[in-house]
């Protein structure tokens, strides 16, 4: 049972200490979107994200109202793009599809324009990495990352 003291303490944190929930994240697998045609891949990625996350912002806002604590960011995290883009010759197309999906759903940002190269760097990873500057300059909501090492895998020195 919640006590009066706990309620007052929470109200104090919200009012005086600006308590908030920093981020809620919806994780979406894109493995079902794989295609040997990059335009089809981009369309499938957009459609899947837009459909899956269509209610994310609304639900986040409902949670804010229900618990009385602001949620600063609503975001989407997807399968690392390099894992689904083996046949893509222009990865920026995929970046733009991700960005359009973020805009359509109303989220603050979308992560997953990423490569996991801790165990080596196939051609798809290299193409994606080379495209990051262009992708970030031509999108509004996209976040990108490169994983170069882990405790288990070590660091790939190539």
Regions picked out by a protein language model, each given a short descriptive name:
Residues 136-157:
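Cap/lid and interdomain-hinge subdomains that line or gate substrate/regulatory clefts
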């Amino acid at each position: 049972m919640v006590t009066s003291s706990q309620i007052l303490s929470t109200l104090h944190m919200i009012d005086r200490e600006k308590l908030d929930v920093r981020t809620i994240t919806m994780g979406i697998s894109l493995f079902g979107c794989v295609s040997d045609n990059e335009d089809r891949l981009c369309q499938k990625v957009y459609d899947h994200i837009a459909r899956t996350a269509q209610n994310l912002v609304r639900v986040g806002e409902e949670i804010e109202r229900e618990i009385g604590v602001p949620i600063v960011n609503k975001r989407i995290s997807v399968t690392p793009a390099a894992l689904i883009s083996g046949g893509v010759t222009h990865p920026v197309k995929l970046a733009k599809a991700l960005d359009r999906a973020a805009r359509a759903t109303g989220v603050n940002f979308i992560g997953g324009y990423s490569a996991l190269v801790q165990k080596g760097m196939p051609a798809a990873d290299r193409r994606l990495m080379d495209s990051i500057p262009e992708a970030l300059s031509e999108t509004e909501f996209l976040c990108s990352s490169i994983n170069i090492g882990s405790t288990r895998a070590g660091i790939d020195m190539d």
